[in-house]
């Protein structure tokens, strides 16, 4: 008989600062040793459920609760945070916010030190988990100096060392390149099997989590559970698309191909589908002529070092007017440093040519009138309280006449679909709307190139689509779009050129479909093929042709 380890019974929760409950009538039992994925759009209540589990609610965020919530048969909110920490361990989305020690070894030992563990036992457990998670060579290093994947392993070791029976992962893939994300999912699965932990994963990237099996998926929206069952059962419904969650790419492609999936019972794993070689025939469409584009911004021999360590190595890059470019590569490849160089945030060696004119001497303000740099988190860019004032800020700092400011701000707000909100406080906006405000604040300065760092990281399908369709509109109006991204599907769907960076060098300049069909290049860049590649192998068709077919269908084109 299965043993219940976590139980919510008709459970509701309302934050002190809100009138309506965030969780409503939750009935959910998690059994010992299960591995459960919790999905839902932004604001659905899934993070609140996790915060109830790990004690952030009610110890940090207060509110009113109704119904029952039990952990191992005990009333959860009656437990001390200390007792709960020995039952539930959490790996946060922001690993840097979780580090305590000055070295990896100190960080791993932190929980044991708090428990006054004997020194010999402490050393033994630190060594055990460092060895298990391949951290032995890193024990003397600062956690902050590690790659994204290494940081995740240190965070995981830091909670595993306490040997809690319940592990909670809060969006573990949000800041990782594709290969590092895959490695973490494999590691979570390995720990789950070897240690027998009860594992809960809160994550938007459903297909990436399903790289390894889960027992159940719980879909939450508007504070209620809409689905609680197996991955195969969920994928057979329309609930994912109805609730703003991206379905696996191979399923989308199969539907485009006209394959009947109604009788398929194991949709969660491509290998288990009954489709076979020769079932689908692709016709190659004649290659479309690409109009010649003019050079807009050219970088020549650009190099940059930090503490005598080369970060950018003699880069050559020609950004042409009207392009949509994705910059990809593993964590630490130099992508963000390149963005800072393009934006004149750092001083580098090399030449910068704007329409063949040397602009290396640009100040940050002058470069911002050519290239607008949009950070991943809009809250880090916003400086004022009101929408109009935020968009007007750059013009006011430049001493522009107030009458002209009003004209230019109103025009930009109309372009960005924000004119009706011009007198609103920014705090009243959604994440996607805030993103528009930050883009408006750079467009108003006249920027031709919009440079975005992870434009959709951590966003559900609704916000993802809203942001990317807005960027498509700006592209249609003549803007050049450059995006740094870890999202291979975003790269495929929304770019026509991809730059691949490895260790500060551009090792490839190609089109998305070609990159995703080149296993050797993907390995070099710590990326991974999309499930279209694996689907192509199963159907015995050319991966490049199938990827091109998907992209054309997505853009509304039909093969002859």
From Swiss-Prot:
Residue ranges the record marks as coiled coil: none
Record-annotated ABC transporter domain positions: 6-247, 297-528
Cellular component, GO annotation: ATP-binding cassette (ABC) transporter complex
Protein name: Putative ABC transporter ATP-binding protein SP_0483
Any GO MF annotation of the entry: ATPase-coupled transmembrane transporter activity
Main location: membrane
Amino acids binding ATP 1: 40-47
SMART domains on file: AAA
Cited function: Probably part of an ABC transporter complex. Responsible for energy coupling to the transport system.
Binding site for ATP 2: 329-336
Annotated compartments: Cell membrane
Pfam families cross-referenced by the UniProt entry: ABC_tran (PF00005), DUF3744 (PF12558)
Similarity annotation: Belongs to the ABC transporter superfamily.
EC number: 7.-.-.-
